[in-house]
Amino acid sequence: MMYRNNLLISFDFGTKNIGVAIGQMKTNTSKPLESVSYVKGVPNWGKINNIILLWEPKYIIVGLPLNMDGSYQTSTIKAKKFAKQLRNKFFMPVMMHDERLTTIEAKSVLFKKYGYKGLKKKLIDSESAVIILDSWMNSIYFKK
C-alpha cells in the first residue's frame, strides 16, 4: 500500500456506529468523513475496507474510551479489540488515543455550527473522530 501525504484515519468506536475522520499530519488538519453503521451486530468491514483502500492512511487512530478516573469500562475492551482487528486486517500501525469528553465537545461544535439540526448521532460520531484525531496530532507535535 502506498501512503499519501502522511494521511491519517481516526475511528470513534461505538457499538452501533463508528465515526470516521481523515487528517493530514503535514497540515495538522482533519475533517469528518462519515459514520459506519454495524451490520448484524458487527462493524461493516466492507465499508471500513473501502475507506482504508481509498485513503491509504499511514496511521490509524482509534479512540480509547476511559472513565474519567482513567479506568477501563466495557467499551474500552471492545475498542481495543476493534483496534487489534484493524491492525490484523490492514497490517498498518494502529494507535489508541484517549477520547474522554469527545462526544460532549463534538455536540458543542455541531450545535454552534448547525443548531439542533447538527445533533444527529452520525454527525456526532464523525465529529468525535475529528476531535480524537486533532488531539492525537496535537499530542505528537507538542512532544517534539
UniProtKB/Swiss-Prot annotation:
Q: Name one GO molecular function term.
A: nuclease activity
Mind telling me which GO cellular component terms the entry cites? cytosol
Q: Which InterPro entries match?
A: RNaseH-like_sf (IPR012337), YqgF (IPR005227), YqgF/RNaseH-like_dom (IPR006641), YqgF/RNaseH-like_dom_sf (IPR037027)
* One example of a Gene Ontology biological process annotation: rRNA 5'-end processing
Compartments (UniProt record): Cytoplasm
Name the Enzyme Commission number(s) assigned to this protein: 3.1.-.-
Which chain regions cross the lipid bilayer?
none
Give the main location.
cytoplasm
User: What's one Pfam family the UniProt record gives for this protein?
Assistant: RuvX
EC supergroup of this enzyme: hydrolase
Keywords, alphabetical:
Cytoplasm, Hydrolase, Nuclease, Ribosome biogenesis
Q: What SUPFAM superfamilies does the entry give?
A: Ribonuclease H-like (SSF53098)
Q: Which family does it belong to?
A: Belongs to the YqgF nuclease family.
- Function of the molecule: Could be a nuclease involved in processing of the 5'-end of pre-16S rRNA.
Entries under HAMAP family matching the protein:
Nuclease_YqgF
- By what name is this protein known? Putative pre-16S rRNA nuclease
The encoding gene is yqgF
